């Protein structure tokens, strides 16, 4: 992969269906705006009025009866066709009961009442799923169990239109919304009125109420009855369920996924017959009471689900223990836990069906962003996003489902979610609200990318279309060939009826609208602040598969202080996406245009970013600037130019980067590549000058600095330079080498080195070296982890410093490291705390700190910490045998510059104990196979480790000599 490509892909994250930036836009169709949608709706209404089958119905006012289900529907062709598609796919007559958009009052439906009614209906209880979060169940993965979306769409999205050439989103948001959706959210007084109106319809959450969601209080002071479910049945499906059978609870504090786990067992059996677990959210508030023996729980199975692995409805009675001898002070803590339990169960979200948890997560993401970043949205954009909360549940769920899919188009006939009661009604409401686009056989596809629509078709359907078009001479059978053939027939003008034929086969299709896609991309980026994370992380947390650390979010500066900062950042990411897509498609003309545009933007960025501000943001916020993105694009561009041997262009870009980006860890890489490319152009004197300047640059560190120093030593021989550099001896230091031989499986150039190990099994060079050191090399034990084990040790020993309360470094609840970890600010902001910890390590108590940190945080996500790969036993051995002084020096080095030194460490960490009292020694080994050489980063690490007093060597593995 080209240098810089992986970093750019991570930055982009989910590709947007966005138009090209103005400077990159070619002759592409104009983007579809909200006004276009409104105009289409008017044309449909007019067409429906003129062609209505009833004859008397006029436009949108005409109503007809559906011949399938008998429901009254609007008499327009569009509405009739859409409704018939949905009815026919059901296969049975079914009366629609959900209100239409015009009847909807836009007050939030009581979640508690909804959950209560569903769980109290025996026919529907089996279709409900819990909040899940269960330690042992993946049944709540809605993408695995509940959905049946059959779309063959690709992830590639076209880029119709021009971002700056099309109407602004904020100017068009209101045209797609029904009048009763646009509430006056722009003013505080009006907004408060809306909130009060919505809250007036919500049920009471008072813990003393006789009915609180799923909680039935039989005696508010002593006992409660809770209707809940058993999750995790897939692990215990061999246990037969019996309706009415008594059950009991058993704590499982040793559970690796969830220390609050509670098992559900059959009561009264001699041997434990485990049925599953309680949902995670319920177990979280119930576990403290059970651990302290404050309550006693018993219950029964109230129903047996139709599907073997579905969640099992149960009823629990939780009884408080009472002791007349206990004093008031003794009862305060238990009473607090009891009240916390009552309030938590009374909250409707606690026992919310897992199939709708994604809906709540999506809504909470929008709410959080609007609360903390509202200054980055116009009033009309806010109204558009706020209207999502006013949509009925079916509409919200359908939108979240398709938004999290690749798509972009989905057939209505292929969508089936059991938590959505009326798919057709939900789609119509979303279309009227402007959240989705909908196409059917009556629509014109000229405003859409035909390729995206064709992607919905299967291969047999494409072949049938070609037959209908009498193109029997086409012999292609592969999907991409059929797709190209259909597009060719349409674009050359020989088959103008192709769009109608395609829609005849696809039926009604939906996708997220451009406006919704743009705004929600912004919402998601502001919520997670990166491209690596998305809505799936909510689900991973709910399931207990990922646990994030506990830290304080102390925010004193906004990441984007002004909307112009965000818009520039968004445009830069758009350019990065176009660059990435163009490389995929080998469109070198567009790649070159992206590089040139980034050069121009970068040259003007400092003037804009250095504008005087009352409180400048922290330096580690620079990653969220447009110039940071453009520098990544240009870094990748240099790799592209060098690959094509366009050294003149590469030199120009590198000089631009070095002259405009003053503080970036990539300066070392840029200086090195510039020096190398100048030498390719036979400009050795200039190459030497660049290398000499790079050596004294404070931002040039680690491997890049060593590489530049070695270049200076090589190029500065007389007569260019008569004086020997002061670092000449350091960079030419001899590194201890050990040579071993092995029997190779193959000797092919470029193939991975595979050898026969000491035990006769095939292995790599690292495993062969481990076997050598364990046997002939001196009885060492060890692990092949490169820097992984050291990063894990750093995270565990420095946990408190990493997650200490420092302003602005924690902006979201989904972070595994502070924002300043890879900057110089990390050490400066925590110097006292870090040095205090290093003093303890140097004094020899690193092992105690390691054990304590492991027990407190096991399983919690932290940058660099790998819980599965490294056992506590190996970590303890590494810490003890390394020694406090050397370990403290290594950890300080990482704390000072984590980014530069988090890679390139030796392959093997070896240790051996010298006596029973725990004394030991450690060795680090870099293993090299035939034809392998040390990288500059590896050389830099070895020199640093030698300075710290580590025993370091290079083990070279070579094939057995043929003379033997």
Curated annotation (Swiss-Prot):
Which PANTHER family does this entry report, sorted A to Z?
FANCONI-ASSOCIATED NUCLEASE 1
CDD domains membership: FAN1-like
UBZ4-type zinc finger span: 63-92
Q: Which UniProt keywords apply?
A: DNA damage, DNA repair, Hydrolase, Magnesium, Manganese, Metal-binding, Nuclease, Zinc, Zinc-finger
What is the protein name given in its UniProt record? Answer: Fanconi-associated nuclease 1 homolog
Q: Which GO terms describe its cellular component?
A: nucleus
Q: Where does Zn(2+) bind?
A: 66, 69, 83, 87
Q: Where does Mn(2+) 1 bind?
A: 907, 926-927
Q: Which GO terms describe its molecular function?
A: 5'-3' exonuclease activity; 5'-flap endonuclease activity; flap-structured DNA binding; hydrolase activity, acting on acid anhydrides, in phosphorus-containing anhydrides; phosphodiesterase I activity; zinc ion binding
**Would the keyword Protein transport be found if you checked this record's keyword annotation?**
no
Q: Which InterPro entries does UniProt cross-reference here? A: Fan1-like, FAN1-like_euk, FAN1-like_TPR, FAN1-like_WH, HIRAN, Rad18_UBZ4, tRNA_endonuc-like_dom_sf, VRR_NUC
Enzyme class, broadest EC rank? hydrolase
Name the Enzyme Commission number(s) assigned to this protein: 3.1.4.1
Cofactor binding description: Binds 2 magnesium or manganese ions per subunit.
Q: What role is this protein assigned?
A: Nuclease required for the repair of DNA interstrand cross-links (ICL). Acts as a 5'-3' exonuclease that anchors at a cut end of DNA and cleaves DNA successively at every third nucleotide, allowing to excise an ICL from one strand through flanking incisions.
What residue stretches are annotated with the VRR-NUC domain? 844-958
Indicate which residues the UniProt annotation says bind Mn(2+) 2: 786, 907
Task: Tell me the cofactors it needs.
Answer: Mn(2+); Mg(2+)
Reaction(s) catalysed by this chain, per the record, are: Hydrolytically removes 5'-nucleotides successively from the 3'-hydroxy termini of 3'-hydroxy-terminated oligonucleotides
Region Disordered, residue ranges:
31-56
Q: Which PROSITE patterns match?
A: ZF_UBZ4
A Pfam family assignment: HIRAN
